[in-house]
Amino acid sequence: MDVNPTLLFLKVPVQNAISTTFPYTGDPPYSHGTGTGYTMDTVNRTHQYSEKGKWTTNTETGAPQLNPIDGPLPEDNEPSGYAQTDCVLEAMAFLEESHPGIFENSCLETMEIVQQTRVDKLTQGRQTYDWTLNRNQPAATALANTIEIFRSNGLTANESGRLIDFLKDVMESMDKEEMEITTHFQRKRRVRDNMTKKMVTQRTIGKKKQRLNKKSYLIRALTLNTMTKDAERGKLKRRAIATPGMQIRGFVYFVETLARSICEKLEQSGLPVGGNEKKAKLANVVRKMMTNSQDTELSFTITGDNTKWNENQNPRMFLAMITYITRNQPEWFRNVLSIAPIMFSNKMARLGKGYMFESKSMKLRTQIPAEMLANIDLKYFNELTKKKIEKIRPLLIDGTASLSPGMMMGMFNMLSTVLGVSILNLGQKRYTKTTYWWDGLQSSDDFALIVNAPNHEGIQAGVDRFYRTCKLVGINMSKKKSYINRTGTFEFTSFFYRYGFVANFRMELPSFGVSGINESADMSIGVTVIKNNMINNDLGPATAQMALQLFIKDYRYTYRCHRGDTQIQTRRSFELKKLWEQTRSKAGLLVSDGGPNLYNIRNLHIPEVCLKWELMDEDYQGRLCNPLNPFVSHKEIESVNNAVVMPAHGPAKSMEYDAVATTHSWIPKRNRSILNTSQRGILEDEQMYQKCCNLFEKFFPSSSYRRPVGISSMVEAMVSRARIDARIDFESGRIKKEEFAEIMKICSTIEEL
């Protein structure tokens, strides 16, 4: 039946039709090759925004540094990073005046967290700059390498397992005259392959000891490695993002913990909450402004955009903020928190891989590493690159560029939000002392500003005052990219507000479909995505039913598991037909075994195995849920797993789904080729860590016990826990005397080892 498409919209309010404007089908763009050019752009731009600042030289590393703080007041509308210290401090003071006790309470909360955080907090996170190998590594490996080298250099505070003690080692390492590190190198040699008789390149990995003097070590400790940000839509040019090393990470974590605690108490902050909670918080601010703008008052909202937010922020300002926020706190706490901004004021940006040159005529390719850019003849480069290199040359040391101003992407999101909110806070009538007043929302660099005034001139004056106030703290509202509307219609962090936040379902579209993990997980994730969108994004019942049918179809095509009675021929149809004919209760077969789909929008919350369990033949149940099935290598069985789903905008989101482990929850084996490369040792390390952590979790399931606080090694903690558990089990009669004695003996043996 042909449907006239306009009929679909007869009952839909126009703002809900936003989901039909989805432009992002297809894959997002990924970056290839080197990020060196983008990083140089960032460094040069950041210095340009602060060019009228004062130049100094770092006495330890010899790096030239530009300090724009308290620089000239802006005379034009160009973006600039000249924040005024006294203005920032005053904004903080007013923020505290409007929220009595906010800083004090957040400091107390943070202090408690600082004393309890374990060093394994730093294993979270993805790629991390590993200063020992001078390249990126998984976070857990980078941390392990750092600790290993600290210990071999006599820094042992970290053995307590507390993050704060590891940070003591970091501080001490910076005072050492030299650090001895173990670094990897590759040997390549040509050998003849026995099987194919061809010549192949064999790589062996060697380890060698290397001494770093104080200067070289400091440069590495202060280095942020840079990469190109992938999968950014709607941009013509790529941009660089930074990944800091282990020395900086712990300090940043504590600063962000404090800032997060403050943001939670600020109604204008869009962080750290998300989703529906965020929408509710924001809707409150809008409601407040609309109710207070009586009939005589106008209310306008700016959907704001800031120019190069983090390139105009300055770590020195963050230091001033922290100094103010923690002013009545113990000395040790103030010191720990001030180290991150100090390290960022002295940071170095690693330029990445360098440039690749190729000669078409001679079919030659050669890589010019970043280290060589300082003194290579520029005649080989095109005009654009020449200019970049000339500009950055005075800043280069060992292939890294000195970058004192600016923050690099994504480092202090929470703290910079506090700064933004402090300016929004100044919009109250008691501070503006005139007829206009403002309020708004801030989430990292994204903001919405609501201005109320008796007439249009007042609105204009209010916006101007906000704009100028921002300039004083290094925030540059872009006049070109911000637009103003009557309050009631605006956009903030990709939420569209029109008399309430409009459910915008198109953002989630890329996450509908088959994930490609395995048959079991994919089915579970697929129905969970549909369920979540019905709850959160106004996905209506009819559309959800359709999405479900499309998903099942997609799933069957992906895994070639069409129903046993279908005519479609695939590689699997012979086996599936045979199974179909042998099965008495066909409704009990999983969709991935050629069974029928029993899902509808009412039972999406039930895992498929549970939904069909009662309908299954007994022998099918036995095959399906058999941990001894030799064909399946099982993960640890968790009741809940996490999947990564990709919305159209913003970062990948983690989504929980129910995991019932069956013989369909297989894990593909790791690619063999990695085992022959330099990464092999890293893999083995990672597996060892994984095993240790799993074992530890077995002894201390998070539900029953707070993590052991205090100074003991993992082994000691596990042994003492085993003894306590054994005693309880023995006294309550759950285990016999012999078993109890045996456990105690094992514990003693382990201790002696």
UniProtKB/Swiss-Prot annotation:
Q: Which residues cross the membrane?
A: none
Main role?
RNA-dependent RNA polymerase which is responsible for replication and transcription of virus RNA segments. The transcription of viral mRNAs occurs by a unique mechanism called cap-snatching. 5' methylated caps of cellular mRNAs are cleaved after 10-13 nucleotides by PA. In turn, these short capped RNAs are used as primers by PB1 for transcription of viral mRNAs. During virus replication, PB1 initiates RNA synthesis and copy vRNA into complementary RNA (cRNA) which in turn serves as a template for the production of more vRNAs.
> Which residues lie within the region annotated Promoter-binding site?
249-256
Question: What's the protein called, per UniProt?
Answer: RNA-directed RNA polymerase catalytic subunit
Primary location class: host cell
A GO molecular function term, named singly, is: RNA-directed RNA polymerase activity
Question: PROSITE patterns under this entry?
Answer: RDRP_SSRNA_NEG_SEG
Its assembly, as annotated, is:
Influenza RNA polymerase is composed of three subunits: PB1, PB2 and PA. Interacts (via N-terminus) with PA (via C-terminus). Interacts (via C-terminus) with PB2 (via N-terminus); this interaction is essential for transcription initiation.
On whether Cell membrane is a keyword of this UniProt record, the answer is: no
Instruction: Please state which protein family the record places this protein in.
Output: Belongs to the influenza viruses polymerase PB1 family.
Q: Which organism is it from?
A: Influenza A virus (strain A/Chicken/Hong Kong/96.1/2002 H5N1 genotype Y)
* Chain residue ranges for the region called Disordered: 52-82
> Locate the RdRp catalytic domain: which residues?
286-483
- Provide ranges: composition bias, Polar residues: 55-64
Keyword match ATP-binding? no
Where in or outside the cell is it found? Answer: Host nucleus; Host cytoplasm
| Gene name, Swiss-Prot/TrEMBL | PB1
Q: Where is this motif: Nuclear localization signal?
A: 187-195, 203-216
